[in-house]
Amino acid sequence: MNRRTAEVERYTLETQIRVQVDLDGTGKGKFRSGVHFLDHMLDQVARHGCMDLEVEAKGDLHIDAHHTVEDIGIALGQAFAKALGDKRGIHRYGHAYVPLDEALSRVVIDFSGRSGLFYEVEFPRDRIGDFEVDLFVEFFRGFVNHAQATLHIDNLKGLNAHHVAETIFKAFGRAVRAAVERDARTAGVLPSTKGLL
């Protein structure tokens, strides 16, 4: 069975991004984005998504992290679209609930071919260290627009901003893992009655 891998390079006047993904990996990650808290979250995605993921980025961090975070989401979405190909034989849908102490989040994803982000997260503060938490929505929007996926992210409980972020990214990894997993019973079959995703 072919491994589902992809490499994407995205170069703009604001950022230079390289992403490698192996959807059939073991959870290994290597991250050098210059945005340390995002690297920590991407490591959660790789580990809990059981995918191998490498991200290298150089961005205009002297301004802020916005372009770098958003463009990593875009490149990751492009890599997923490339690795999944025509999506034959995958489950297509995935969901996960993840707790961390007082925090609890739910993520549901559909690799439907239709892009949509439905993000209901209230952080108890604006920053985690020097990371602006409103950049998470830019990351996920970039991802769904280029992976052509519908993504629902709901934080159900949480008092600690770091815990909230971790539950979101761990649940995202686990939901993605479930959705892209191959289903032996439907090998070679497109998971849609429409005949196209």
Curated annotation (Swiss-Prot):
Q: Which reaction does it catalyse?
A: D-erythro-1-(imidazol-4-yl)glycerol 3-phosphate = 3-(imidazol-4-yl)-2-oxopropyl phosphate + H2O
What Gene Ontology cellular component terms go with this record?
A: cytoplasm
Please give the SUPFAM superfamilies that the UniProt record associates with this protein. Answer: Ribosomal protein S5 domain 2-like
**Which PROSITE patterns does the record cross-reference, listed alphabetically?**
IGP_DEHYDRATASE_1 (PS00954), IGP_DEHYDRATASE_2 (PS00955)
Q: In which pathway does it act?
A: Amino-acid biosynthesis; L-histidine biosynthesis; L-histidine from 5-phospho-alpha-D-ribose 1-diphosphate: step 6/9
Name the predominant localization.
cytoplasm
Q: What class of enzyme is it?
A: lyase
Where can this protein be found? Cytoplasm
Q: Which GO terms describe its molecular function?
A: imidazoleglycerol-phosphate dehydratase activity
The domain of life for this entry's organism is Bacteria
Output the InterPro entries linked to this UniProt entry: IGPD_sf (IPR038494), ImidazoleglycerolP_deHydtase (IPR000807), ImidazoleglycerP_deHydtase_CS (IPR020565), Ribosomal_Su5_D2-typ_SF (IPR020568)
Annotated GO biological process: L-histidine biosynthetic process
Q: What is its EC number?
A: 4.2.1.19
Q: Which Pfam families match?
A: IGPD
Q: Which UniProt keywords apply?
A: Amino-acid biosynthesis, Cytoplasm, Histidine biosynthesis, Lyase
Q: Which family does it belong to?
A: Belongs to the imidazoleglycerol-phosphate dehydratase family.
Q: What HAMAP family does the record tag this protein with?
A: HisB
Please give the name of this protein: Imidazoleglycerol-phosphate dehydratase
Q: Which gene encodes it?
A: hisB
